[in-house]
UniProtKB/Swiss-Prot annotation:
This is Fetuin-B. It holds the Pfam family Cystatin. GO terms for cellular component: extracellular exosome; extracellular region. It comes from the Eukaryota. Residues 1-15 form the signal peptide. Protease inhibitor required for egg fertilization. Required to prevent premature zona pellucida hardening before fertilization, probably by inhibiting the protease activity of ASTL, a protease that mediates the cleavage of ZP2 and triggers zona pellucida hardening. One of its GO terms (molecular function) is cysteine-type endopeptidase inhibitor activity. Residues 262-320, 363-382 are annotated as: Disordered.
Amino acid sequence: MGLLLPLALCILVLCCGAMSPPQLALNPSALLSRGCNDSDVLAVAGFALRDINKDRKDGYVLRLNRVNDAQEYRRGGLGSLFYLTLDVLETDCHVLRKKAWQDCGMRIFFESVYGQCKAIFYMNNPSRVLYLAAYNCTLRPVSKKKIYMTCPDCPSSIPTDSSNHQVLEAATESLAKYNNENTSKQYSLFKVTRASSQWVVGPSYFVEYLIKESPCTKSQASSCSLQSSDSVPVGLCKGSLTRTHWEKFVSVTCDFFESQAPATGSENSAVNQKPTNLPKVEESQQKNTPPTDSPSKAGPRGSVQYLPDLDDKNSQEKGPQEAFPVHLDLTTNPQGETLDISFLFLEPMEEKLVVLPFPKEKARTAECPGPAQNASPLVLPP
């Protein structure tokens, strides 16, 4: 009996140790450098950018120009975390349009807005799970100085705030033209989103602006002010106003947003290079996505900041390393932090994933950065 008691105590200690949660013993060196033109990396980058655009409520849809850096943290049966640095371009689609970034047009060079996004993206192929854990983006307009050296007569961007009466006039005049030509609904100005000016046969102003439905029709003009107005933007208009000594020229086109219904599969396609198993992952993830009010997904997962162009006086003091400051600090613990991802799975289970800090240094491999869709130095981050 004297020998049985120590033996029982040893067995109890071993069992308790087996049931204890494993200690974090991780190192950022666990990150695997990936080729920026690998088909699966491009597909994951496409999914990440799709979700970045879906998460935003303001601004224009961002388009992938190239993968600048890609690192993967493989977690065995739990899938992989991708740490992506993406060079992006702003398109002509507003995010409220809910259009896939692949289907949005690229802006002409003198209107370009470009930048960089960092994203942490989780993929579990066997369980068919895709999830954007966090992102941050920094954007700048193309340098006015460089545009002027290339095209001195091209339109130049101007502030969109309400203090610029020429911009406000161009928006209200062009919207009035649209309302006059529209036989039923009337619309009012919600917000000017872009503006530029140019001298043609006189001063010309070009504007893009969000519109909302007016609570009345033309026949109700006298009682319109007595009715409440819906403040939700319903479309994006592009207008222009040119004045000469004798007359003015006004033009306008409007593109209306679709209803806020769930996006269809056509809006969620991956990038052109599609591994055969990834579309199945996306299809199932659409069906198994939890409600948007899930506590685990509440709140924004990132942000997009706009800075002046690099030749602006406010940017002169910053060196190349600070040109596009994009910080993604989901965790600063070098050993990583656990992230509860149970809500991503259809089956009731408890799943936790260790997330490492976003790497401060790029992998610097021969395969990165990848080839750019637009290789102009004007729109590539330094």
